[in-house]
Amino acid sequence: MKILRKNHPLLKIVNHSFIDLPTPSNISSWWNFGSLLGMCLMIQILTGLFLAMHYTSDTTTAFSSVAHICRDVNYGWLIRYLHANGASMFFICLFIHVGRGIYYGSYTLSETWNIGIILFLTTMATAFVGYVLPWGQMSFWGATVITNLLSAIPYIGNTLVEWIWGGFSVDKATLTRFFAFHFILPFIITAFALVHLLFLHETGSNNPSGLNSDSDKIPFHPYYTTKDLLGIFLLLLVLMILALFFPDILGDPDNFTPANPLNTPAHIKPEWYFLFAYAILRSIPNKLGGVLALVLSILILAAFPLLNTSKQHGLIFRPITQVIYWIFIXNLLVLTWIGGQPVEYPXTMIGQIASITYFAIIIILIPVSNTIENNIIKL
């Protein structure tokens, strides 16, 4: 068996990626989230496949087909809630994975990091088009508001919006194409995830100390396979608790009402994992400025490798930047909270302050603290 896995053309790839892969001996549980994201992706594809067997992407029947899945399909309610809450678990793991990458300086592996940003954007696009499919009030109005943002693009904006809608409003054509996008995008994510792994295995994993670990590596199996299994069991436990005890806690009550173009909900907001970006969008009074800030709130992650001037790898021995990092995390939580609040004082003002802080930390404070820490080392 050992000879087969080392020589067989297909098994050799698996062997070099998951069995004999030399891995730093000191990587902590923060490194588990890559495998957890893979697990989340598999859960989403499987549950999504079974949902697609019963769902109809037609404006007249979409809402009732989701109700039919929950009422009449064997364990349909479980599949639906695993899929809905699985998306939330996916984004929790994704945020932690990116946060770990920033804290431990994994952005220095620039190809892996940039593919990761593409993965992040593709996952956000998948979640957005998926949220439209149940055709509830928030699905419809969320789709209308977010797609309408493209009209801010000079000259081609309005044409682009009508092209995406397939008409002059969000309607049957929009729902059908969003279903098609939602079905195909997870497979594109899977392909990008493999490229992400390919680039990672070219350079080898980073580690918590930020030091070179070439002299202290151990095989991935059995050490990290068992460690990942523990993480997967814990993830499944949390997901099952969410799906079985609190299935609608992260959803929006407006989505229990079928989509009605003549009745606008009091507060239109996306799913919780987009609220930080939505708060940044709303904090700028100008429409085009808001859209640019929304896009930059994700693309600014690409600035981390470019703005990095530190002589040390990661934040483990850098107390000043550590403080700034945790302010950044708290600021993100504030943005998430503000994104779900009505557009009125003082929420608008807090949103504007938090949005300025978000960009200032990445562009100004972290590079300045890097320079200060570099000078302290020289003393």
Swiss-Prot record:
SUPFAM superfamilies: a domain/subunit of cytochrome bc1 complex (Ubiquinol-cytochrome c reductase) (SSF81648), Transmembrane di-heme cytochromes (SSF81342). The keyword Metal-binding applies. Keywords: Electron transport, Heme, Iron, Membrane, Metal-binding, Mitochondrion, Mitochondrion inner membrane, Respiratory chain, Transmembrane, Transmembrane helix, Transport, Ubiquinone. GO terms for cellular component: mitochondrial inner membrane; respiratory chain complex III. The keyword Membrane applies. The chain crosses the membrane at residues 33-53, 77-98, 113-133, 178-198, 226-246, 288-308, 320-340, 347-367. InterPro entries: Cyt_b/b6_C (IPR005798), Cyt_b/b6_C_sf (IPR036150), Cyt_b/b6_N (IPR005797), Cytb/b6-like_sf (IPR027387), Cytochrome_b (IPR030689), Cytochrome_b_C_euk/bac (IPR048260), Cytochrome_b_N_euk/bac (IPR048259), Di-haem_cyt_TM (IPR016174). It comes from the Eukaryota. Binds 2 heme b groups non-covalently. One of its GO terms (molecular function) is ubiquinol-cytochrome-c reductase activity. Its cofactor is heme b. It is a multi-pass membrane protein. Heme b b562 binds at residues 83, 182. A ubiquinone binds at residue 201. Heme b b566 binds at residues 97, 196. It is found in: Mitochondrion inner membrane. Heme 1 (or BL or b562) is low-potential and absorbs at about 562 nm, and heme 2 (or BH or b566) is high-potential and absorbs at about 566 nm. PANTHER family: CYTOCHROME B. Component of the ubiquinol-cytochrome c reductase complex (complex III or cytochrome b-c1 complex) that is part of the mitochondrial respiratory chain. The b-c1 complex mediates electron transfer from ubiquinol to cytochrome c. Contributes to the generation of a proton gradient across the mitochondrial membrane that is then used for ATP synthesis. The cytochrome bc1 complex contains 11 subunits: 3 respiratory subunits (MT-CYB, CYC1 and UQCRFS1), 2 core proteins (UQCRC1 and UQCRC2) and 6 low-molecular weight proteins (UQCRH/QCR6, UQCRB/QCR7, UQCRQ/QCR8, UQCR10/QCR9, UQCR11/QCR10 and a cleavage product of UQCRFS1). This cytochrome bc1 complex then forms a dimer. Belongs to the cytochrome b family. This is Cytochrome b. It comes from Akodon boliviensis (Bolivian grass mouse).
